[in-house]
Amino acid sequence: MATPDPTQQAWDPVALANQLQGVAEKSQKLLTGFLSAQPNSGQIGMGDASTLGGAFFDLMTKMMSDPTALANAQINLINEGMTVWRHAAERMFLGRESEAAPKDKRFKHPDWTENAVFSFIRESYVVAAKSVLSSVHDVKDLDPATARKVDFYTRQYVDAISPSNFIATNPEVLTTTLQTGGQNLLRGLENLLSDLDRGEGRLAISMTDKSAFRLGENIASTPGKVVFQNDLMQLIQYDPATPDVRRRPLLIIPPWINKFYVLDLQPKNSFIKWSVDQGHTVFVISWVNPDERLAKKNFEDYMLEGPLAALEAIEKATGERSVNAVGYCLGGTLLASTLAYLAAHDDDRIASATYFVTLVDFTEVGDMGVFIDDEQISSLEKRMQERGYLEAQDMATSFNMLRANDLIWSFVVNNYLLGKEQIPFDLLFWNSDATRMPAAMHSFYLRNMYQRNLLAKPGGVTLAGTPIDLTKIKTPTFLLSTREDHIAPWKSTYAATRLYGGPVKFVLSASGHMAGVISAPGSKYGHWTNDDLPPTPDAWFAGAQAHPSSWWPQWDEWVTAFDLGRVAARAPGDGELPAIENAPGSYVVVRSDG
């Protein structure tokens, strides 16, 4: 039997109290300085939670109507709580080893397991969190939208009250505070005030050292030229890397919710550079970061001034009428819409279509659905009408909430409680470089696609006077989804296999919405393939073959079938379009956070 460890770290409450008093005195000066620098224009914004009251009222009503289920949940909580108390007593008085902490990054510090007090706190939280979540999840007779909303926001609450997020109950924070004399908390407060100041009163959590990256130098650095531009986009043509190139150019249509260079972070994981190295003449749309002057730009404008304008420009630049096209996320939704538009006009300029993590059937959108209802959209539209656009931070916050522990609370702990210096990380630098969206376009997108799912219905959406029917698309299609995607759930993207009228190949990558896409050869993520397309995604996965390597070479093999031979390498500016400026261009450098 193990015996109590007399060397276990003892906390000195007097020393800690003295240090915290000193921190409080210094922090008062910092806070006073911050507040005096704020414009006298109202309180610090806290976001819009007005739509939650009705959902939780429905939840409580349904809970109270089933007292037996409520009583059973309480009994289960008491029983599990007694187990936690028993474990704590056995550890304290009998020297019992603490159970290993679950694989949860919040509790990786050894004291969460080795220290009796923090082990008890951790186990108590896990039991309480499980009880709350299961009680909410098991409530009967809630309509699906309400059930999803209360489940999502209950998880937000449970994540927020984790003991790892508080000074007094996080052993790593307490240890660091003792070791530094509270300097970590002062640095953390400085970080907090800096983020509040950068967000103009709204908390804009810093995720990485932004000063470590310069666009065009050590990120988004694949050589190329801007060869065309209009109000909505710049078109980049990349320099060739091979003596000859594939005749048919490759057009990449990224989303405009964020910026294209997620596909060009570093040479080792740049899909753009890798495609150039395979002999593609790569063109990429770099969308503008819009302001109030583009408030009236609609979804059809993005089609007309985006891919359709790019097709004309590419023909002038290369002499080639047709392209292979890739659409990423919202860019894929636009690509599908464009293909249906072209099909209606007997236009075959897109020879093959590749979709990265793209929704076209919005029947089931996962947790994103909690933000989509009449009340919330109307509130958002009102704010957008006042500004002319959706604030970049609004969308970024919504995405971050989908993975709150990774993208919110881990940074709260590291930045504000531990006072750590931020580490340069290319993907987080890109993630923090969010863009605004025109009011008219975003309202159309939310109403017609997310809320009403009209794109999946033949003729449900009309663009530039043309009814859009995805079933008329005969273009060969490659669908790439990712297994852990929290924005475009792969089982939802699979629905596209039943929509398109041409041949379809579906591939599933490991990891999530970004990492699974930029999974370069040599990365740790594999993929799954299945040439059959059964009616359900579960049936597809049951018959899929796992591959330990990147999906990129398989895609390149697929798209090679649509080549037209090879031609001498094309340099930007060789054709009818002169080079305007070096890649990555001037549109991409316009940030929303100044």
Positions of PLM-derived features:
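Gly/Ala-rich beta-loop-alpha elbow adjacent to hydrolase catalytic centers
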Residues: 327-335
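Short alpha-helix in the alpha/beta-hydrolase fold that links the catalytic acid
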Residues: 489-499, 510
